């Protein structure tokens, strides 16, 4: 199961975390930001989880292309490829636009994220071994 448990931290405090009741639980990172809209969305459906897993693999491939090395998260790729057992098995739900409302200009999250990265995160832009995406100049 991918279930919510209250357990004791290394310091003896009770903490809420999600547990995979198989060998994956000992190798994945501890859960953080479990109430973030994107984390909630990921747990809503197997299709959501699978979309995010595919996106993770694409990001790792892009990192390898740009920097010529393998990102540390790549070690977890196959472990995270299969969704937890108790996710609801229904169609993909609408992805949230998890950003300040000033950047939300559409019902389409892709449009909103493009707007957010063009206008709210331009200080982060570097295009190592790549040209900027076409939508960046539109």
Residue ranges and their predicted role:
Residues 1-8:
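Short, small-residue-biased leader/transition segments that mark boundaries at the very start
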Residues 15-66, 72-73:
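Amphipathic alpha-helical packing elements
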Residues 69, 76-83:
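Primarily interfacial, aromatic-capped hydrophobic alpha-helices that serve as membrane anchors
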